[in-house]
Amino acid sequence: MLRAREAVRTLPSYHPPLAGRQGLRLDFNENTIGCSPRVLECLRRLDLEQLARYPEREPVEANIADFLGVTASDVLLTNGVDEAIHLLCQTYLEPGDEAVIVVPTYSMYRIYAMAAGARVVGVPSGEKFKLCAETVLNRITERTRFIAIANPNNPTGTVAPPQDLLRIATSAPQAAVLVDEAYFEFYGQTMLGTHRELPNLFVTRTFSKAYGMAGLRAGVLVGNGDQMPSIRRVSSPYNVNAVALACLPAAIADQNYIQQYVKEVLDARSALERTLKAHEIPFWSSQANFVLARIGASTADSAAFVQQMRARGILIRDRSADPGCEGCVRITLGPQAHSAKLLKALQETLDELRVVQGASRS
């Protein structure tokens, strides 16, 4: 009988709640107003002959490399950051190797590492969800071959200082160290450049968040030029579709659009944090386009809150299943108009839940 590999049979399933997403989508950290008008114009003017030809990635990689200030040989365009994670695991992990992941964090680090046959070593973050470099260093062994750190982290929005990331990378030269900068635009600090001196350091960026192109599935993997040929051997030569490749130059050319969107998101983030503080709801200071807040003590509390917000047309994400996140929800931020709708629904939901809780105690 045909059977999947044991590593695959034991994989945890990742099923994001994609069904029934009617309303204001503040649950997946997407750009809530969409991509740049230049990208839309590019789509309208798309040469249909491009769809009949295999996509040519290299010219766009050179364009992206110039935008990032790195050499083209250091850049690989990927089918979203997910593929970049997969490629690193396929390139560097052998069965029985160890992958170090600071939790809570993005689920696909664990899944791709396990699929490669690695043993995942989960390192709990501190009370404030801050990465502790010493704790990570203490979990690194001679079997460690992959270390994944999202910076800013998802779902917490917290960040690790560059010096800590450098310490980790220099302390584990035998491991591929990924710094996932999917939310870079909302934070502004990067590890790009250090990859030239550290051949085991890799940085990823995405066009799914600030750029509003999640449906086109485009990401960037940057690494030392000596390492990238090995990763290219694992990658499909046609991994990024022609439509995405046609749109990427237009996307990076319109930085005014990105900067204005980011400014509105940061303003909305501040407004949400002020509101949460006023209601004495615990939250973690975020450097991303979302905020993680502890609505209650249990999964039931966060589930009830998510349902009440959904009833008001606002979708947010229940993160109670993540380590240390019991009773927590993650709320994506958008421009001013969306922020106003969010805060109104938030106030109404909090008022209603207080009434229900008060009635249950009486």
Language model regions located:
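N-terminal small-domain helix-loop-helix segment of the aminotransferase-like
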Residues: 2-82, 87, 353
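Short acidic capping loops at alpha-helix termini that bridge into adjacent secondary structure
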Residues: 71-75, 95-98, 143, 181, ...
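PLP-dependent aminotransferase-like
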Residues: 91-149
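Active-site phosphate-binding strand-loop segment of PLP-dependent enzymes
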Residues: 127-181, 185
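PLP-dependent aminotransferase class I/II
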Residues: 200-284
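Conserved PLP-binding catalytic core of the aspartate aminotransferase-like
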Residues: 266, 278-312, 329
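PLP-dependent enzyme catalytic core of the Aspartate aminotransferase-like
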Residues: 308-312, 317, 321-362
